[in-house]
């Protein structure tokens, strides 16, 4: 009986030498900031649809989204504490990401080059500019992805549409190109 117990103990010891530890990678924490989304659309349903794109891009990144409310609060506090008046720099975005304990930060904004004010022959404002979406690795401080969409002499709806376009293209790029985050 003791020989059997010793043999079993020996087998268990030998088997334990050949087992592999499996390391499970956790999903990266992703913060998403969409600057000017409320200004670029008047339709609440469109705004909600645009916000749903945030979760889709995080899903494409195989990440875990930091709640929008928490991200917005940290960004607002950062703006007030650091007296940011125009837009975030890369350093600002990285600092916000660190405050949120994020691995990546996704940032989109429409950058205005020119505004044509309403006048005698047209009654709506027209915009020229670029909607840019960037994904920044907070730890390495590097851009991992960047895409833009031009708006030339477009209305407010065109600015909103450009936001949808950059999100849709980004989601497709991440999935099709197999970008790793």
Stretch-by-stretch model annotation:
Residues 8-19:
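Bacterial N-terminal signal peptides
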Residues 19-25:
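Sec/Tat signal peptide C-region and signal peptidase I cleavage site
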Residues 25-31, 51-56, 96-100, 115, ...:
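C-terminal/domain-edge helix-coil "capping" segments
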Residues 40-42, 114-120:
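Extracytoplasmic/secreted cell-surface and envelope-processing proteins
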Residues 82-83, 121-123:
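Short low-complexity, flexible loop/linker segments enriched in glycine and/or proline
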């Amino acid at each position: 009986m003791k020989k059997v117990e010793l043999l079993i103990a020996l087998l268990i010891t030998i088997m334990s030498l050949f087992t592999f530890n499996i390391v499970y990678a956790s999903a990266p924490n992703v913060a998403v900031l969409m600057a000017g989304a409320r200004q670029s659309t008047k339709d609440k349903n469109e705004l909600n649809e645009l916000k749903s794109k945030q979760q889709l891009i995080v899903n494409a990144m195989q990440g875990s989204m930091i709640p929008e409310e928490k991200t917005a609060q940290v960004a607002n506090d950062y703006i007030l504490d650091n007296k940011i008046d125009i837009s975030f720099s890369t350093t600002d975005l990285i600092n916000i990401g660190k405050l949120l304990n994020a691995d990546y930060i996704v940032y989109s904004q429409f950058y205005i080059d020119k505004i044509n004010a309403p006048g005698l022959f047209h009654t709506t404002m027209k915009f020229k500019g670029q909607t840019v979406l960037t994904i920044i690795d907070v730890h390495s401080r590097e851009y991992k992805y960047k895409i833009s969409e031009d708006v030339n002499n477009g209305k407010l709806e065109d600015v909103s549409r450009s936001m949808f376009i950059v999100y849709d293209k980004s989601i497709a790029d991440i999935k099709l190109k197999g970008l790793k985050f």
